[in-house]
Amino acid sequence: MALTLADVDKIARLSRLQLTAEEKEKSLQELNDIFTMVEQMQNINTDGIEPMAHPHEVALRLREDEVTETDRAAEYQAVAPEVRNRLYIVPQVIEE
């Protein structure tokens, strides 16, 4: 699958990006390189290969949960401008 400049134009428009002609050409090349790599990966025969969560054998060193610090929330919240139900109240910065 190869993209065209029209595809890049559409992606840029949907993403609300304004790209120069040079940026469009560069994006086209980079996207086509990605698709080429994906196609190569899809053509690899993986029959008989077990799925794995991690490529390396990992043994986690587990330990008991122990409290190592005291609860200092009251101390921290004492200097906050506004706290309600142990939550910091901050000005709204994102419109609904």
UniProtKB/Swiss-Prot annotation:
It comes from the Bacteria. GO terms for biological process: glutaminyl-tRNAGln biosynthesis via transamidation; regulation of translational fidelity; translation. Its EC number is 6.3.5.-. GO terms for molecular function: asparaginyl-tRNA synthase (glutamine-hydrolyzing) activity; ATP binding; glutaminyl-tRNA synthase (glutamine-hydrolyzing) activity. The lineage of its organism: Bacteria, Pseudomonadati, Pseudomonadota, Betaproteobacteria, Neisseriales. Pfam families: GatC. Allows the formation of correctly charged Asn-tRNA(Asn) or Gln-tRNA(Gln) through the transamidation of misacylated Asp-tRNA(Asn) or Glu-tRNA(Gln) in organisms which lack either or both of asparaginyl-tRNA or glutaminyl-tRNA synthetases. The reaction takes place in the presence of glutamine and ATP through an activated phospho-Asp-tRNA(Asn) or phospho-Glu-tRNA(Gln). Keywords: ATP-binding, Ligase, Nucleotide-binding, Protein biosynthesis. It comes from Neisseria gonorrhoeae (strain ATCC 700825 / FA 1090). This is Aspartyl/glutamyl-tRNA(Asn/Gln) amidotransferase subunit C. Belongs to the GatC family. PANTHER family: GLUTAMYL-TRNA(GLN) AMIDOTRANSFERASE SUBUNIT C, MITOCHONDRIAL.
